[in-house]
C-alpha cells in the first residue's frame, strides 16, 4: 500500500518492486497494487467507458499497465483509493513530450461501501472467489471484456457467452482462441490474453535517505564533473575555429546540464536498481533529463480548478 498521509514529509519516497503473487491476492477485494493482467477495479460501478480508454492518437483500446493502492488517511471518502494507469500498445503513438497515449484513472470509496466488508480482508485465501468469473463484476453485474477486463457489452453473436469492449478485441480473441472454442462447452472462464502485460504484485518499501557522506560524495562528483567539463572546454578550443562560437556554447551548456540531471537520476536509483515505481504524493519527480521538464503553466488544473500535484512515477519500461 502506498501511504498518502498529508502529514508526512513531502520528500518521503516509497519505492515499488515487482514480486510474484498468487492470483487471489491480486483481486479487487485484496486492494492490490500490481502490474499487468486485467485491472482490479476498486469501485465496481461507474467504470470508464470505451472512448475514455482509447488512445487519443490511434483510437485503439489502451492496455492496463499498473495500479497503485494509495488511500488518503483522515478522509472517509478516500479510505480506499486506487490509481490505474493505461497505455497504448502502438509504438508509433509514442512521440517526444506527448502523453496522449497514456491515461490515469482514480477510483475511491469510503470504508463503509456496498462492495467490500468494513474490516480488512483476511491474509488467507478465501474459500470462495466471487471474482473467479472474469466475465462480470460481482455485486454490480457490470460485464467485462474477455480480452482486457474493461467494461464490455458487445457480445459474441454465436455463443453469447463472452463480451468485448469493442470490435477490435472481439477480432483479437476470435483470431487467437475463440474461433476454436465458440459454441463449445469447454470455453474457459479465465484466460491469459496476448493483449495483457504479465501480471505481478507491486510491493513497496520506503526509500532510504542519503546520509551526509553520500551527499558530500555527490557534491564532490559534481565538482569533478564541472572540472572535467572545464578541461574538455580547454581541449576543444582548437575546434572553435571551425564551429560557430554560439553553437558551441549552446551545445556545451545543454550537454553539461543534461548529463548532471542524468547522473543525479542514476545515483538516486543505484541503491535499488529494480524499482519500478516511485511514490511521493506532494513530492517531486526524479527527472532523467533536463529537457522537456514541464513548467507549472504546462500542467493543467483539475476539473475543480485546483492545482495538480505530483503523486508517483514509473521509472522503468514494462
In which residue ranges do the predicted regions lie?
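Preference for intrinsically disordered or flexible, low-complexity segments
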Residues: 1-318
Amino acid at each position: 500500500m502506498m501511504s498518502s498521509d498529508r502529514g508526512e514529509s513531502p520528500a518521503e519516497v516509497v519505492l515499488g518492486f515487482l514480486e510474484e503473487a498468487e492470483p487471489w491476492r491480486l483481486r479487487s477485494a485484496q486492494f492490490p497494487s500490481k502490474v499487468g493482467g486485467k485491472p482490479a477495479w476498486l469501485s465496481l460501478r461507474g467504470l470508464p467507458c470505451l472512448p475514455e480508454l482509447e488512445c487519443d492518437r490511434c483510437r485503439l483500446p489502451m492496455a492496463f499497465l499498473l495500479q497503485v493502492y494509495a488511500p488518503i488517511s483522515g478522509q472517509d471518502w478516500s479510505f480506499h483509493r486506487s490509481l490505474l494507469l493505461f497505455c497504448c500498445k502502438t509504438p508509433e503513438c509514442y512521440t517526444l513530450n506527448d502523453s496522449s497515449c497514456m491515461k490515469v484513472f482514480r477510483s475511491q470509496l469510503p470504508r463503509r461501501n456496498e462492495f467490500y466488508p468494513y474490516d480488512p480482508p483476511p491474509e488467507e485465501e478465501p474459500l470462495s472467489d466471487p471474482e473467479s468469473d472474469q466475465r462480470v463484476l460481482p455485486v454490480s453485474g457490470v460485464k467485462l471484456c474477455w480480452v482486457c477486463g474493461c467494461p464490455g457489452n458487445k457480445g459474441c453473436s454465436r455463443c453469447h457467452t463472452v463480451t468485448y469492449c469493442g470490435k477490435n478485441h472481439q477480432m483479437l480473441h476470435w483470431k487467437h482462441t475463440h474461433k476454436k472454442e465458440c459454441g463449445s462447452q469447454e470455453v474457459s472462464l479465465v484466460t491469459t490474453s496476448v493483449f495483457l502485460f504479465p501480471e505481478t504484485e507491486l510491493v513497496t518499501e520506503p526509500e532510504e535517505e542519503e546520509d551526509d557522506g553520500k551527499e558530500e560524495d555527490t557534491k564532490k562528483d559534481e565538482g569533478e564533473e564541472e572540472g572535467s567539463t572545464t578541461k574538455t572546454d580547454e581541449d576543444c578550443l582548437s575546434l572553435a575555429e571551425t564551429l560557430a562560437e554560439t553553437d558551441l556554447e549552446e551545445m556545451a551548456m545543454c550537454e553539461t546540464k543534461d548529463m548532471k540531471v542524468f547522473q543525479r537520476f542514476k545515483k538516486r536509483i543505484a541503491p535499488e536498481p529494480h524499482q519500478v515505481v516511485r511514490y511521493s504524493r506532494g513530492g517531486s519527480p526524479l527527472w532523467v533529463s533536463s529537457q522537456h521538464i514541464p513548467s507549472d503553466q504546462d500542467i493543467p488544473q483539475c476539473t475543480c480548478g485546483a492545482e495538480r500535484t505530483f503523486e508517483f512515477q514509473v521509472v522503468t519500461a514494462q
